[in-house]
Amino acid sequence: MHVEFRFNVTYSVDQLITEGENTKTVHSAYIVSVYVDSTGNMVLIKNPTITSIPKKSDYKPKAIESEGTVDSITTNEINEFLTTFFKLYPTATASELSYYVNDGILKPIGKEYIFQELVNPIYNRKDNQVTVSLTVEYIDQQTKATQVSQFDLVLEKNGSNWKIIE
């Protein structure tokens, strides 16, 4: 399947401008067009163009809740699997990821992040699969900043091993 996308991305920039003794803040907004090919590679196809600053939407995403369909033994297994995986993930190669993840689901990131914790994992069983919605907290070794990433995954157990399949 050959899928391609084009996205328009609006972003804003705050600049602190100093001229002699005077300092002022200038707030500007721009829009760019980004082309994404079927493998996830991206390229800007339109230079940043001035635009108005969009208003915040009233949209409120529906909170995902546990349906109580995953027992405590399975929850502990998945917690252990995900903790192991997310400790390895930042520095793992594609070959190493293949033991934990179906091809291309999560790509190597090549960063020196130190795993901190799984935050609010929510597990729900659907047939022989478990859907997972969670946040993962890392410390970036270069900046010492906390890196927080959200993941929505589908796990499946083959034999005694869990694997991320979506």
Stretches with model-predicted labels:
Residues 1, 54-110:
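Core segments of small alpha/beta cavity-forming domains
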Residues 8, 22, 41, 47, ...:
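Detector for Asparagine
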Residues 13, 34-36, 86-89, 155:
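Hydrophobic, Leu/Ile/Phe/Ala-enriched alpha-helical segments that form helix-helix packing faces
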Residues 17, 31, 45, 50-53, ...:
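Weak global preference for isoleucine
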Residues 20-67, 150-166:
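Short beta-strand edge/turn micro-motifs at domain boundaries
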Residues 95, 103-107, 126-130, 160, ...:
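Generic structural signal for short, solvent-exposed loop/turn connectors between secondary structure elements
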